[in-house]
Amino acid sequence: MADKDKSKDKEEKSIKIQETFLKERKVFLWGEVSDKSARDVTEKLLYLEMDAPGKEITFYINTPGGSITAGMAVYDTMKLISSPIKVVVTGMAASMGSILLCGADKGKRFLYPHSRVLIHQPLISG
């Protein structure tokens, strides 16, 4: 029973942390760009735009890349909203992650000192 209580407390603390970051207009993409992660990021960007249009959003990314269509949904949302987006790479922005980094305007793209960016030729099948 004690393990369940600890698990519940940990989950509640995690939710509280996420809410705090969202109030500070900070959005995170950790891991692969997928339909699920893109939906999460897109929903948060649209919510923050609705909450305070034109106020800066900080978008932290650490991703090896992933789905082109999911990533382009995030990219298009970044370009659609009026809020300026500052992108901060905290580990890696590879493949689609590098495209998301490029989605920020000039002067709004940042990397932590040990971060890496990987840009490669597009992969076309068929």
PLM features: residue spans?
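Terminal-region recognition feature
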Residues: 1-126
